[in-house]
A protein has these predicted regions:
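General beta-strand structural signal in soluble alpha/beta enzymes
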Residues: 5, 30-31, 67-68, 89-92, ...
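Active-site nucleotide/adenylate-binding loops and adjacent lid/helix of ATP-dependent enzymes
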Residues: 4-5, 99-181, 211, 235-251
C-alpha cells in the first residue's frame, strides 16, 4: 500500500521512517518533507502543502493511508477535506483540533468536563489583562490563544515580564492573530511529562511516556522553544501516574469531546504537570505527536505503525497493543544560529546521514542545496537520537553521535536527560 505523511519536521521524518518499515508498505510519500526524508532510501518527498492539491495527489497515487504530523494543516481542515474525498486519514477534524488551535477553547472544555488544569482567565483587552496580573501577582503564565509554533507561552517570574508579554501579544500584535486573545493562568510547580495517545473516537492506545526539554539552555534556562531534546520512557510517569492520567485526563477528554458532538480521532498529546504528591494538572493539549518526543518514541516502537494507525482509523484500537523496546531512547536537538528568534538558514550540514548505529539522525529544518548537500532551513535543524540500556548510556551515545554532525552556528543543550539521570 502507498502511504502519505504530511509535514516537514523531525516528527514527520520519524513517523515516515517508522511507517516505511511495515512489510505492507510499498511507497511512503512525505509532503513536503526535508533533506532527511529525501536521503532515506524508502521515502519520497513531494513538494506540496496546499490541501486541495494534497487531496488530488492522494487520489492520483492511490494513497491508502495518510498521517498528519503538524498542527497547522489540522487546524485548516486537512482531515475534513480528505474524508470528504473518501480518503483514509489519521488526525482530528478542524473542529476537534480546536483543543490545540485555541487555548481558550481547551481551557473552557476542561472546566466544563472537570479535567484538572490551572485556574485561568481569557482577555482580549490589554488594560483588563494588566489589572488581572496586578491582582494575581507573579509568577504567572501568559499564553497566546492561537497557534504560535510552541513560542506563544511566557512563564513570567516577575510582574514586569508578565506585563511585557501582554503588551507584546495584545498591544504590539507580535504574534498576529494567534495573540489577539491571551489566556492568563496560575503558575504550576512540579515535573512536566508528555502523555501521548492514539484515539479512534472512543478507544485509546497509550504510547510510551516521554519528557521534553522546553528551554533553550542548560539547567532549563533561557527562552521557551519548541523543544530542545526528549527521552522515552519518562520515569516520572510511574504506573500509578499512567493510570491516573488515563482516568482523570485522557478518557474524560475523549468522552467529553464526543458529548460535545465532536468525535476525536488522531494523536492526542496531554502536557501534564505532576506535583511532588502525584497530583496531575493539564498544561495543554496538542492534537498531534510532540516534536522532539516523537523521535525517541518512534525509535522505541517495535510494533507495525501502519497496523496501529489502520486500527485507529477503523475504530478498533481496543484490538491492538503496542510493543516497545525496553531500552531508553534519547534525542538531542541541534538548532540553528539565532534560534528561537530569527534562525539563520543556508548553512551546509556535514555528517547528518540518517542511518547510524544504535540510533537515527532525524532531520527537521533542513533541505538539499543545489549540490545535493543538506543545509539548514529552519530553527530546529536535527534531532540526534540514540538507544542505551540506561539513561546515562543513551545520553552518552547520543552525544557521541552528535559530535560527528556539524554546521556553522549550531547550538544544542549539553544536559538532555538530566532529570532522569539525577532522579532519586
Amino acid at each position: 500500500m502507498n502511504v502519505l505523511v504530511i509535514g516537514n519536521g523531525g516528527r514527520e521524518h520519524a513517523l515516515a521512517w517508522k511507517l516505511s518499515q511495515s512489510p505492507r508498505v510499498g511507497k511512503v510519500f512525505v509532503a513536503p518533507g526535508n533533506a532527511g526524508t529525501a536521503l532515506e532510501p524508502n521515502l519520497t518527498n513531494v513538494p506540496i502543502t496546499d490541501i486541495d492539491v494534497l487531496v488530488a495527489f492522494a487520489q492520483r497515487e492511490q494513497i491508502q493511508l495518510t498521517v498528519v504530523g503538524p498542527e497547522a494543516p489540522l487546524s485548516k481542515g486537512v482531515v475534513d477535506a480528505f474524508r470528504k474525498a473518501g480518503l483514509k486519514i489519521f488526525g482530528p477534524t478542524k473542529a476537534a483540533a480546536q483543543l490545540e488551535s485555541s487555548k481558550d477553547f481547551a481551557k473552557a472544555f476542561m472546566k466544563r468536563h472537570g479535567i484538572p488544569t490551572a485556574d485561568y482567565e481569557t482577555f482580549s483587552d490589554a488594560a483588563k489583562a494588566h489589572a488581572y496580573i496586578d491582582a494575581k501577582g507573579a509568577p504567572i503564565v501568559i499564553k497566546a490563544d492561537g497557534l504560535a509554533a510552541g513560542k506563544g507561552v511566557v512563564v513570567a517570574m516577575s510582574l514586569q515580564e508578565a506585563h511585557d508579554a501582554v503588551d507584546s501579544m495584545l498591544s504590539d500584535n507580535k504574534l498576529g492573530d494567534a495573540g489577539a486573545r491571551v489566556v492568563i493562568e496560575e503558575f504550576l510547580t512540579g515535573e512536566e511529562a508528555s502523555f501521548i495517545v492514539m484515539v479512534d473516537g472512543k478507544n485509546v492506545l497509550a504510547l510510551a511516556s516521554s519528557q521534553d526539554h522546553k528551554r533553550l539552555k542548560d539547567h532549563d534556562e533561557g527562552p521557551n522553544t519548541g523543544g530542545m531534546g526528549a527521552y522515552s520512557p519518562a520515569p516520572v510517569v510511574t504506573p500509578e501516574i499512567h493510570a491516573k492520567a488515563m482516568r482523570e485526563v485522557i478518557m474524560p477528554t475523549v468522552q467529553g469531546m464526543a458529548r460535545d458532538g465532536i468525535i476525536y480521532t488522531g494523536f492526542l498529546y496531554a502536557g501534564l504537570m505532576i506535583s511532588p504528591e502525584g497530583q496531575l494538572k493539564t498544561l495543554e493539549f496538542n492534537c498531534r505527536m510532540g516534536d522532539p518526543e516523537t523521535q525517541p518514541i518512534m525509535l522505541r516502537l517495535k510494533s507495525d505503525l501502519v497496523n496501529l494507525v489502520e486500527h485507529a482509523v477503523e475504530g478498533s484500537l481496543d484490538k491492538v497493543e503496542a510493543e516497545w523496546d525496553r531500552r531508553v531512547a534519547l534525542g538531542i536537538v541541534m538548532a540553528a544560529a539565532n534560534y528561537p528568534d530569527t534562525p539563520r538558514t543556508g548553512d551546509v550540514i556535514t555528517g547528518a546521514t540518517p542511518e547510524v548505529e544504535d540510533g537515527h539522525v532525524f532531520h527537521a529544518g533542513t533541505k538539499l542545496n543545489a549540490d545535493g548537500q543538506p543545509m539548514t532551513s529552519g530553527g530546529r535543524v536535527l534531532c540526534v537520537t540514540a538507544f542505551g540500556e540506561t539513561f546515562k548510556a543513551a545520553q552518552k551515545r547520543a552525544y557521541e553521535l552528535l559530535a560527528g554532525v556539524n554546521f556553522d552556528g549550531e547550538q544544542h543543550r549539553t544536559d538532555i536527560g538530566w532529570r532522569a539521570i539525577t532522579r532519586k
